[in-house]
Amino acid sequence: MAVGIENTIEEARFVEQARNFDIQRVIVKIGSSLLTNNGRGLDRTAIYEWAKQIAKLHKQGIEVLLVSSGAVAEGVVRMNLEERPKKLAALQACASIGQMGLIETWWSALIQHGIQSSQLLLTHDDLSNRSRYLNTTGALTQLLEWRVLPVINENDTITIDEIKFGDNDTLGAMAAAMVNADLYIILTDQEGVFTDNPRDNPNAKMIRQERAMADYLFDIAGDGGKLGRGGMLTKIRAGRLAAMGGCPTVIVSGAIDDVITRVVSGEAVGTLLTTNDQDKIIARKQWLAAHLRMSGSLIVDAGAAKAVVEHQKSLLPVGVSEVRGDFDEGDVVEIVHQDTGERIAVGQVNFSSRDACRVARERTEQFDRILGNNEERVVMVHRDNLALTM
């Protein structure tokens, strides 16, 4: 067990107790190891069983979105390959082949219960670009209004750096944010999050409930922890990302009988990662700090840099000396000190690059004259949407 964990975890966190959910919309993510019998091809029996559980929720009026891995593994089987390819082109080809079987199987399993399904293949670029993000959200909203169940997967055929273990955990969390889901369920091959690896330590306890932002979770599931190789780290990170939008996450074994319906009904199976208003802000800042793709740059003077870094203030337009790049309102940009050239923060900007150029170096009282329309925006980047990087 990680150092200090005994003193960090309260016994109440191990107690089975009913969970009071009010769920209208749920995301269910199922990993490759469950879907493919650990790489031996799609487990159609299991898929049909999960479809039956999803159908029960559907009949109750609960909207379900499914994030399904397994395309690459199914492609390997269909091509009779002895092992998973290492070359990117071969991985992408396997994803293209396997995706056909994956969607075909889910469609067949769901249509038996009168549920129409659809395929949605996404990349991180689709979700980091505001215009495509809004288009994707609109499509998902329409599908749900039509009572169609979206089956979402990473578009491994065209991505370069996203074919890696655990990525669909993140994709599911981002989908939860897009549609304002009430619950995110991650089905895995482990019963939940443990204080140690239960395969090695018979005294390991399963954590029944914890805040998604609890730091010690990374200690026991991080890269240096005993559970890191099992992919639990990506699931905890996904739980934190879901927390940013106020969505709780349950990490649970997909092999448990009626697991999906039992989780939604509030039964204490698996590990529940909870969130609150303060956690939303913390999680949002962590997500911003980890954002790899900047849409542009705001160059700020020394006074603005000091206000942001030392006093944790919002970035005001008057402190912005230069705007670089082409971005939309809501995109993530870097904030750079004009004297040192150092990135001091990243944040979600309240203006498009065009409008940001117009209000840069201007005081708030000038905004109506510059932009018109009774302009209500007063900050370039709000402090709740800003994360320091130095």
From Swiss-Prot:
- Example GO biological process: L-proline biosynthetic process
| GO annotation, cellular component aspect | cytosol
EC class: transferase
Q: Which GO terms describe its molecular function?
A: ATP binding; glutamate 5-kinase activity; RNA binding
Keyword annotations:
Amino-acid biosynthesis, ATP-binding, Cytoplasm, Kinase, Nucleotide-binding, Proline biosynthesis, Transferase
Record carries keyword Transferase: yes
In this chain the PUA domain maps to 295-374
What the protein does?
Answer: Catalyzes the transfer of a phosphate group to glutamate to form L-glutamate 5-phosphate.
What protein name does the entry list?
A: Glutamate 5-kinase
